[in-house]
């Protein structure tokens, strides 16, 4: 009898016998403005804090790779992003509801 994967308490998807977990990723992005501004306005610009929700494809020392869409019966991934680790503030694994 084939071995069945254990049910996880976290939201995930299994593709080709590999489990990918769903995360809420909080990260910082550049904010730009090409208009003229005085010093006070220029110094007041701050990076944008962004939220992305996606499946974690893989991560290494420098990058986190995610996907949001996939082919159910094959290893085809869409809506992909690569986040430099230095930009990621927090990664939260999402519980299954």
Where would I find each of the regions flagged by the language model?
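Conserved RNA-binding domains used in RNP assembly and mRNA/RNA metabolism
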Residues: 2-97
């Amino acid at each position: 009898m084939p071995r069945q994967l254990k049910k996880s308490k976290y939201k995930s998807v299994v593709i080709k016998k590999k489990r990918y977990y769903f995360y809420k990723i909080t990260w910082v992005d550049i904010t730009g403005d090409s208009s003229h501004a005085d010093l006070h306005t220029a110094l007041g610009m701050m990076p944008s804090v962004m939220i992305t929700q996606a499946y974690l494809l893989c991560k290494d020392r420098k990058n986190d790779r995610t996907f949001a869409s996939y082919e159910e019966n094959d290893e085809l991934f869409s809506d992909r992003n690569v986040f430099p680790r230095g930009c990621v503030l927090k990664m939260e694994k999402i519980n299954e509801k």
